[in-house]
Amino acid sequence: MQRVTITLDDDLLETLDSLSQRRGYNNRSEAIRDILRSALAQEATQQHGTQGFAVLSYVYEHEKRDLASRIVSTQHHHHELSVATLHVHINHDDCLEIAVLKGDMGDVQHFADDVIAQRGVRHGHLQCLPKED
C-alpha cells in the first residue's frame, strides 16, 4: 500500500468525517478507499462491453392497463440477462419487483431503461457491479 496526501476544504472534510462515523469506518483512509472503489465500479459499469451483475428494483401498479404483461414481455425479450426475480405484493394496488441481472452492462442498462420507462412504473433504480476477474 502507498501513502498519499490530499487537500480537502473544511466543509468536505467535515462531510467525510460525518460519513465515516455514520458508516462505522475506523479511519478516513478506509472511507476514501470505499468511495474510490464505488466510483471506479460505477465508471466500469457504464462502458458497453463490460460484463457484470446488476439489481433492478421498481414498484408498479399491477392494475395499470396491460402494465404487468408489458413488463413480463420485456423480461422475456431480455431473458438471457435474468438470473432471478423477486415479486412482492406491497398493497392492493402496488407490487415491488427486484430483478438480479447478469451480462453486458450496456444491455443491462437498456433493459432497465425499458422497464423503468413504462407508464405506471415508479421508483426504478439500477445498481450495477462490474464482474471481478
Swiss-Prot record:
Pfam families: NikR_C, RHH_1. One of its GO terms (molecular function) is sequence-specific DNA binding. It comes from the Bacteria. One of its GO terms (biological process) is response to nickel cation. Keywords: DNA-binding, Metal-binding, Nickel, Repressor, Transcription, Transcription regulation. Its cofactor is Ni(2+). Binds 1 nickel ion per subunit. Disulfide bonds: none annotated. InterPro entries: Acetolactate_synth/TF_NikR_C, ACT-like_dom_sf, Arc_rbn_hlx_hlx, CopG, CopG/NikR_regulator, Ni_resp_reg_NikR, Nickel_NikR_proteobac, Ribbon_hlx_hlx. Ni(2+) binds at residues 76, 87, 89, 95. Belongs to the transcriptional regulatory CopG/NikR family. NCBIfam families: nikR, PRK02967.1, PRK04460.1. Transcriptional repressor of the nikABCDE operon. Is active in the presence of excessive concentrations of intracellular nickel. Homotetramer. This is Nickel-responsive regulator. It comes from Escherichia coli (strain SE11).
